[in-house]
Amino acid sequence: TLLNAPRPVRIAFLGDSFVEGDILTADLRERLQSAYSGGGAGFAPMASPLTAFRRTVKTQSKGWTTYNIMQRKAAPARLRENFYVSGWVSQPAAGASTRWESTDYRKRLDSCTTARVFFLSPRDSRVEVTLNDAQRREFDIAGDDAVRQIAVSAPRVRSLAFKVLSGAEDFVGYGAVFEGRGVVVDNYSVRSNNGQAMFWTNPSVNAQINAMLGYDLVVLQY
């Protein structure tokens, strides 16, 4: 069965402001993880003006310019063409960074064992990843149009930091996923979205990230 598979059972919950800030999905995640194991808060955007409302993960970001798919016409063409189903894309200035930290708002949020960061780096870039404010490593990223993933694992992932050291031009930040073996629930809420925004996302970006994560169930709430 899926629960015995060597990877998490992954659920994507796509909705509007009804689930914004992890409302409803926080309770669903807690119940499923308590019943079937798993941990972590799932997907969290690289940067968003709404992060302060979400209590299941603490996000601190600086140096990013973030665009929402509902206001996609305000985004530069390069970003406008590369939206993911999360509805957010972030463009960094040199030295832009984000730090995510687990909370105790719900059970098992601190049982995260793997974290993954997703981004686009069409040009050569250099990024820094810091695990639990202690283990730091720099990565040289060769320019390519494919979605990139950096994954880290530990007995307990309490925090993760990501920084763009160089190559910020055309770089696109999507966010990070925090998970543990068992059930993962990713909240993809977009305010004022009636479902039509999915047609404004990039099918290739969606397919590439799905190939890396592998969703078993997609819930649509509009």
PLM-predicted stretches and their roles:
Residues E20-Y222:
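Conserved SGNH/GDSL esterase-like catalytic core that processes O-acyl groups on lipids
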